[in-house]
């Protein structure tokens, strides 16, 4: 984690990360393995689908709202999530299902059924205890 997309940062570290992630992405896609992208991983894959980003640094905690959709429909529609990002997702390709958004309309969670990809813009692994809602969401992928 902690990297930015090459269109925003062209450091050697980011170039290396992008190269490695492209290899993993292509392999998983070819083998039809479900994929989970967290923060950078979500933006990395979303970027392959003509996504619009904005420089909106979000660090700390904020609430997101889950939308009613076919992939994930929790009883509690509001979730507080952590955030450690420099860029936000403004607009996704219409073939991508938006699962949750921030009050500023940026996308916080999405699903790409064609490649079985779940993108989360928060870090479920950074909580002291793994939360049930995060577990349920990830479990839907597999």
Describe each model-derived feature in a short phrase.
Residues 2-3, 42, 124:
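Active-site metal-binding loops of divalent metal-dependent hydrolases
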Residues 38-46:
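Glycine-rich nucleophile elbow surrounding the catalytic serine of serine-hydrolase chemistry
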Residues 106-114, 118:
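Short, surface-exposed beta-strand/loop micro-motifs that present aromatic residues
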Residues 120-142:
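Acyltransferase
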């Amino acid at each position: 984690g902690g990297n930015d997309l090459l269109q925003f940062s062209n450091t050697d570290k980011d170039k290396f990360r992008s190269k490695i992630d492209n290899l993993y992405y292509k392999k998983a896609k070819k083998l039809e393995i479900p994929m989970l992208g967290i923060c950078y991983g979500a933006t990395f894959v979303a970027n392959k689908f003509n996504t619009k980003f904005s420089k909106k640094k979000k660090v700390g905690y904020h609430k997101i709202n889950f939308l009613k959709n076919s992939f994930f429909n929790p009883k509690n529609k509001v979730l507080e999530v952590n955030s450690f990002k420099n860029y936000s997702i403004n607009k996704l390709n219409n073939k991508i299902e938006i699962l949750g958004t921030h009050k500023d309309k940026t996308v916080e969670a999405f699903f790409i059924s064609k490649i079985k990809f779940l993108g989360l813009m928060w870090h479920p692994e950074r909580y002291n205890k793994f939360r049930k809602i995060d577990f349920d969401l990830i479990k839907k992928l597999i």
